[in-house]
Structures are given as structure tokens and as C-alpha cells.
Amino acid sequence: MKNILKTQVHVVVIYLLIKIAFSQVKTDFDVNWSTSKMVRITNRLGDGLTLNLHCKSADDDLGLKILAPNGSWSFKFRTSIVGTTLFYCHFTWPGQSKRFDIYDDDRDGVRSHISCINCIWDISIQGPCMFSESDHAFNICYDWNGNLRT
């Protein structure tokens, strides 16, 4: 009986030590496998044009938004741990209908050369331009086919 009680005490002590060790490891080495991001879109069409936009991902439909001239809208999300996050937007204004991948993990994620945490976009008739945090300017510009403009 004494040996059984002693064994049970040892098991409990070992269990508690393991639990404490793992809780400490989580605290010290807590890796956030997904990253929090923010996308802001501003209407820079000019000529007093209103911009309608509808953004989606595979999991989220963010609904129709209507931006007055120079108006902005933003949303936040967490990226996928496998690096496949994609949000695309359908943009319309009088006489035009365009689509653009407003956040693409391959282009904007931590493994890309343009990585952004706050992905800030100006939408013009020529195409979207993203704010460069290193240059402090909207100089990462694309045409509506997704090609980088020079």
C-alpha cells in the first residue's frame, strides 16, 4: 500500500513538472503562426467619381462598400499559416468594372519582397498603388491586370 501511494505521488509530481515545463516553453517561445494584417483602400479616381468595391476571400465576403471621392475603408484579418491568404476586390465606377487582388500572400506576405503589415492602397483609374513603408510614398503601382507599373 505504501509503495502504491509513493508511486502515485511520483506520477503526480512528474505530471505537474511536465505541465509547468510546457507552459513555460509556450510563454518563452510562443510563435504566432499567422500574422495580423490591415488593408486600407482609398478612392483616388478623381473627377468626383464614387468608387464601389466588393472584397472577398475564400472564407470571407466583406460586402459592398461605397467610397466617396478621397473616402477610405479598411479591414483587418489574420493570414493563413500556410501562406495562401488572398483577398480580391471588384471595383466599379461609372463605365468601368475592374478586379484586383488587394492582398496576396505571395506578393504581400512575410516571404515576399514587398511585405506589408498595413497594406495601404490608393485606387486610381490607372490602377491600384500601394504605400511603400520604406519610401514613404505610393510608388508600388499595378495596372488592372496585376502587372507592376514602372
From Swiss-Prot:
Glycans are attached at residues 32, 70. InterPro entries: Cupredoxin, Self-incomp_S1. SUPFAM superfamilies: Cupredoxins (SSF49503). Residues 1-23 form the signal peptide. GO terms for cellular component: extracellular region. It holds the Pfam family Self-incomp_S1. The keyword Secreted applies. Keywords: Glycoprotein, Secreted, Self-incompatibility, Signal. Belongs to the plant self-incompatibility (S1) protein family. This is S-protein homolog 3. It comes from Arabidopsis thaliana (Mouse-ear cress). The lineage of its organism: Eukaryota, Viridiplantae, Streptophyta, Embryophyta, Tracheophyta.
